[in-house]
Amino acid sequence: NKLAAVICIEDPVRPEAPEVIARLKELGISKVVMMTGDSERTAKAIAGRVGVDEYYSEVLPEDKASFVEKEKKAGRKVIMIGDGINDSPALSAADVGIAISDGAQIAREIADITVSAEDLGQIAFIKDLSNNLIKKINRNYRTIVSFNSGLIALGVLGIIPPTTSALLHNTSTLLISMNSMKDIPVEAEIN
């Protein structure tokens, strides 16, 4: 009638998780929410260690998907990161679903992106890359619209002939296309 042993089982928190979450916030992610099927006590402890803004414990798969839908209806873009079968409905409902490579096959199939389980820093890398890609697209768009508007104005005023305008237009399109092919700078990955 004596206690022989106590066994505690815990999924260890990835050591880079707090740094990845901090980096995502620096990159413009305004709210990081953790949803888990774990108990309140476990969820609170993990949430405190990794630095999420909100956490929900004892959550069922359909609750995760409902939360994603609610956030989308509120006008937010939702990125869902998950690795299990229970994450699949929410991964499917999110604007962007990210699966972890060693997770359930269905999660990987449903997700838009799969990142390596060995390097969660890839999530921040992807966000940084996408931010810089959008900046490049917007810069190229403004440049080409401004340049072509100038060509139209010069053509309407009779300052340049149509053949010169066509040549300059095609040259600018080629230069913008070449600029689009240049590497997009991103900061070093988190390891």
What are these regions (language model features)?
Residues 1-86, 92-96, 128-131, 189-191:
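Cytosolic catalytic headpiece
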Residues 26-29, 50, 86-87, 92-96, ...:
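Membrane-embedded alpha-helical bundles of multi-pass transporters
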